[in-house]
Amino acid sequence: CSWRGHRPDMEKVLTLIAPRGALSPDHLAKAAAALRAAGGEAGAMQPLSEAEAADLPFGGLPLDVADRAVRDALAGQPVDAIAQDVIGRRKRLLIADMDSTMVTSETLDELAGEAGLKEEISAITRRAMNGELDFEGALRERVGMLKGLALEALERTWATTELMPGAEELVATMRAHGARCALVSGGFTFFTGRVAEKLGFHEHHSNTLLHEAGRLTGQVGDPILGRNAKLVTLKRLAGEEGLDLAETLAVGDGANDLDMLGAAGLGVAFKAKPIVAAAARARVDHADLRALLFAQGYRAEAFRRVV
């Protein structure tokens, strides 16, 4: 690896990321001290973005031990820490969830608001995303409750849907460096198509809301894209690109993302449900989606935005 300050014995890197302006020298000092206290070596800090992100090269510790040591040392601070090998940290395939990941809301819950059912449907969504309910059954149940809703409600829901901060930079920067970018969601094509177009994803895969005479029928097209389908899509796209799974990045927040996150080279639980954050190898709880670029070693000045 050619990055500045790299030493052969520092074959791993810890990336510290915080909301803009919130990363302090004290955070970096505590992280380095935690690595040394755990029995590792820490090198010189490499800034990625002023008061937002920095790389800390290290060696002599397994990744999970380093992660845990630094998280414990920074507990209660608004700082995310991601430890990984230096070699191969830049990924060539991005697979991203949509709801509460690429957009700030759960689009089905917002659509339910148009039918006056947001509270009831949100409760089911919450349980499904926490892994308490079967995803497919929960999806059919929620869509069934929307039978008869006019299609104009979809347009109104889209008009108020907001992109997650950092989503534009993530997709545009990875695309500019040759990565294939796919949006894979248990949500619906009406929304994934629009999000994919707005952010510049190469493709999108999701479920279809069936409708007739301008109204929802309360049914979902088969087959349903759920937890296993996300994993299958990750493996299929990696195969099409001739990539090892180690060269892939997946990001999501719900229980139906767990298999995909576990299989990707870097699987990131983004502001995720507790069951997901606990199981994922990497997690982002405080920063925005720019964190996924910093984790790959990109400096802020190299970020792109959708043109």
For the regions a protein language model found, what residue spans apply to each?
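C-terminal cap/substrate-recognition subdomain and adjoining C-terminal extension
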Residues: 148, 155-307
